């Protein structure tokens, strides 16, 4: 249970394309960075993890381009808060592309090219961090009620509709 990385409906995803969700993913990425020392990185997803990784990679002297499907970075917060973050990223050298829906990752002799990413630049390293989705299969099979996006429905005490079964975190439907 918990959550798993969302998968984008991209063609061309394979070796050399990374996600960051687990410690194992982190160690794989770290090994890739040490072994290959990429100079240009593309990060698809400008949420918290994407922004943190953009900062971490720029500290390693990697040129970073950050691609966001929506009109602002951190789409979960108000635009008046996201704009200064966008500006700070730009000031540190991150190329921020908003309203950029990447539809394909093409491997070329000179690196990876993002189709729909608003640039023809190629990259040595690609990271896809577009959020998570509930990993509710076990609870669904047990009969738990879920939403259309498979988040487990709970009450104010975090109880599911199943006797003595509680759920919390990325797995459950949130109420804002």
Q: PLM features: residue spans?
A:
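Acidic/polar active-site rim loop that often engages polyanionic ligands
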Residues: 7-15, 66, 70, 176
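Rossmann-like dinucleotide-binding cores of NAD(P)H-dependent redox enzymes
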Residues: 40-42, 48-104
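Conserved SAM/SAH-binding loop
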Residues: 23, 99-103, 118
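Conserved beta-strand-loop-beta-strand element in the redox core of flavoprotein oxidoreductases
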Residues: 106-120
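FAD-site-proximal beta/loop scaffold in flavoenzymes
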Residues: 15-34, 113, 121-176
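Glycine/Thr-rich phosphate-binding loops of Rossmann-like dinucleotide-binding domains
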Residues: 6-8, 51-52, 74, 136-137, ...
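Glycine-rich dinucleotide-binding loop and its adjacent helix/turn
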Residues: 2-60, 148, 154-156
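Short beta-strand/turn micro-motifs composed of small residues
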Residues: 1, 45, 68, 169
């Amino acid at each position: 249970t918990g959550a798993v990385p969302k998968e984008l409906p991209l063609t061309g995803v394979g070796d050399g394309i990374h996600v960051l969700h687990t410690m194992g993913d982190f160690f794989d990425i770290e090994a890739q960075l040490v072994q290959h020392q990429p100079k240009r990185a593309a990060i698809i997803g400008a949420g918290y993890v994407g922004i943190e990784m953009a900062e971490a990679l720029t500290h390693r002297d990697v040129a970073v381009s950050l691609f966001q499907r929506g009109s602002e970075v951190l789409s979960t917060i108000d635009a008046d808060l996201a704009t200064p973050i966008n500006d700070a990223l730009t000031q540190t050298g991150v190329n921020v592309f908003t309203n950029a829906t990447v539809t394909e990752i093409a491997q070329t002799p000179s690196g990876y090219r993002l189709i729909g990413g608003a640039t023809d630049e190629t990259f040595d390293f690609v990271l896809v961090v577009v959020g998570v989705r509930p990993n509710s299969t076990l609870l669904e099979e047990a009969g738990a009620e879920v939403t259309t996006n498979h988040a487990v429905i709970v009450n104010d005490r975090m109880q599911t509709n199943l006797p003595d079964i509680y759920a919390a975190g990325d797995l459950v439907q949130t109420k804002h």
